[in-house]
C-alpha cells in the first residue's frame, strides 16, 4: 500500500466521525422544535376539536383495532419525555373528557363530582352509546388521548368489561367513566346510586302504607243499612 492509501485509511475514521457528529448535532437542534409542536397548548373547545380532526392526528388515534391496557402506547414509543413537556401541553381533565365524548357522539353525558371524603375518585362520568361498537370506539379514543397527553406521574389506565356487550368502565384515577347501552343504564341507575346514596336506601326501606280493614272506599249499592241523618238549617 502506497503513501496515498495509508493517508486515506487514517483519515477515513476521522471523516466518518465528523459526518456522524454533524448529523447528530442537526438532529438535536431540531428536536426542541418538534417537541414544541407536539406539546403546544390548545383550547379544549372547537379549536381543539379541529386540531384533533387533522388526518395525521386521527390516523394515529384510530389506527389500532382494540383497547389497550398498558399506559405507554405505541404513540409514545421512542419519543423522549421531560418534566417540561409534562407541564406545557394540554391537560387531560374533566373538560377535556367531556369534549372528547361529545366529539364521539356520546349521549346523555352525566358528570358527578364525588366528595373528597369518599376517597375514590374526583369525577364519576356516565354516558350512553348507540351500540356495542360505539361503546368500544368511545373508550378506545378516550384512552388513546389520555396516553398521548398523560404525564409521567399519571396512573395507568384500568379497563373493565372489554368482553361485555353493554357496559365498559375505564378508570383514569381522578376520573372514572362508565359507558353503557341505554337499557343497561336504565336498569342499574348509577346516577341515583351516586347522587341520592343513603337517601335512596331510606326510600326503599319505607314500609308501604296500608288502610284498615273496616275502611270503606266508594258507595255501597245496598243503602238499606245506612241510617238517615236529619239536617237542620238555621
From Swiss-Prot:
Xref: SUPFAM superfamilies: Nucleotidyltransferase (SSF81301)
GO molecular function, one term: mitochondrial large ribosomal subunit binding
Transmembrane parts of this sequence: none
Subcellular location: Mitochondrion matrix
InterPro entries named among the record's database cross-references: Iojap/RsfS/C7orf30, NT_sf
Keywords, in A-Z order: Mitochondrion, Ribosome biogenesis
GO biological process: negative regulation of mitochondrial translation; negative regulation of ribosome biogenesis; negative regulation of translation; ribosomal large subunit biogenesis
Region annotated Disordered, chain positions: 63-88
Residue pairs linked by disulfide bridges in the UniProt entry: none
Broad class of the protein's primary localization: mitochondrion
Gene Ontology CC, one term: cytosol
Annotated Pfam families: RsfS (PF02410)
Family label: Belongs to the Iojap/RsfS family.
Its job: Required for normal mitochondrial ribosome function and mitochondrial translation. May play a role in ribosome biogenesis by preventing premature association of the 28S and 39S ribosomal subunits. Interacts with mitochondrial ribosomal protein uL14m (MRPL14), probably blocking formation of intersubunit bridge B8, preventing association of the 28S and 39S ribosomal subunits. Addition to isolated mitochondrial ribosomal subunits partially inhibits translation, probably by interfering with the association of the 28S and 39S ribosomal subunits and the formation of functional ribosomes.
Assembly notes: Associates with the mitochondrial ribosome large subunit (39S) via interaction with MRPL12 and/or MRPL14. The interaction generates steric hindrance that is expected to prevent premature association of the 28S and 39S ribosomal subunits. Interacts with intermediates of the mitochondrial ribosome large subunit (mt-LSU) (recruits the mitochondrial ribosome and complex I assembly factor AltMIEF1 and NDUFAB1); regulates mitochondrial ribosomes assembly. Interacts with MRPL12 and MRPL14.
UniProt-recorded name of the protein: Mitochondrial assembly of ribosomal large subunit protein 1
Native species: Homo sapiens (Human)
Encoding gene (name): MALSU1
